[in-house]
Amino acid sequence: MNIKRITAVALLALTGVLSAAPLKIGWAINDISTDKPVELAGTFHWRHSKGLRDPLMATALAIDNGEDCVVFLSMDFISPPTFVANRVRKRVKREIPDLPPEKIIFHATHIHTGVSIGRTEKKLADEYGNYMVEQIFKSVKQAWESRQPGQIAYGYDLVVTAFNRRIVYFHDRKGGIGMSPRGKAVLHGRSDVPDFSHVEGGADPFANYLFTYDMDGKLTGAIINVGYTAQVSISDRYVSSDTWHDMRKLMAEHHPGVFILPQVAAAGEATFEQPYYKAAEKRRYRLIYGREPAYPGEFQRKQIAGRILTSFDRAHSWAQKEKFSDLPIKHVVRTLKLDPSVPSKVDYEAAKDGLKKIAELRKNPKTTERMRTSLNGRGNVCKRVVKSYENADKLPRVPMEFHVLRIGDVAFVSERFEYYFEFGQRIQARSPFIQTFTIQLAASNGPGGYLATERASANGGYGTRFLCPVSPKGGQEIVEAAVKELKALKAMDKPAKK
């Protein structure tokens, strides 16, 4: 039992004031790869892995000041599997009694070349799942048990890691079966056509960094928080951690022994792919590399990782001038219950029509194998839309694990969805903290899915209504809950009134 932590919590309850205390920091990283013939996650159609291109990793960072704590757990996966978080937390409760298991924030890099446990043959899936749990628990345990007195610094830089991938047209476009509701927007749509109007929204130019040091001021690691989902190699047939492998290689060359922990900021509609200027990009790569890529996305991965490294160095050059060894930490963990997405009559009819078309495609001998393997996923989406519409008055609110954390003048807010960039803007703009890191795809109590804004939902297309378990109103509920908690945490700086 941690008497110091219990005493500090009791004091906080009495005074309502947070106090600075010495930081302890620990890092760990472990491999969660497999070279077995698994199915890859990230697309409606199935992709059978041909092997391992580069390793998947689980990175943990523990920060503790004796009063409160956090363990960030970043995994190269499409989203945090519920069973992994549940099993790891059970082991933590049993084997690491001084670490509150709810203070672990599980989050994913959203790669599209990781393992699809649900599609992989059961025996192999069970084997990989057990291995993954063991390795992730090991990262948590090693990070927690390796904590030493340390310091942090923080900063940001501006860097292009992603673009908005929703192309808007002057007129409605036909939707896709079980994927895209009809509307004016198309994910990855063509921009070189007369009907092109604009790119729907922006993308996050900010890269947020939290740097860690030992007590001698030596850099030991950093959180890299960017509005970028690493899925450049989405067409690959090999297990890969995508851009984060390239970034780890660059860090090993330029900053040997320094850990990095990737976090994806709100970036539900972000992509590596430029919405236009594509011919110019191809020419650029031809002149830089003078050859064809060795594997899908090779050049984009290298370029994005290189830009992040340059950004990292720029931010660190000035952020390191102000290090902190004693800081207040407060970590709030709640379950939010969010407004569910209720399909419209138009989407209901489209989903019913989609089920009919899927049945026809199954019977058609000309249906390609690629399309055939996508029909189960598309059909499940259509069934969910139909069921939700027919039970609209009985739909429960959607639970979501929710973390709000402050470490000094830096704050973190997590949510479990592919959260559109504008929601993240709303949180950061209204936060009372100097820097606020948003973390998407970070939870353990249910699947993710997109969470689109009001504007995006009205425009339709992939990544909106069909694939959103929570409504735009629910997205704003996260914003309001985050701002409320952030203001409450900031208010703890002030002495309690007598």
PLM features: what roles do these ranges have?
Residues 1-3:
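N-terminal secretory signal peptides that target proteins for export/translocation
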Residues 5-7, 232:
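A compositional/structural signature marking long, glycine- and acidic/polar-rich segments
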Residues 7-17:
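Bacterial N-terminal signal peptides
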Residues 21-304, 309, 316, 320-498:
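Conserved beta-alpha junction segments in alpha/beta enzyme cores
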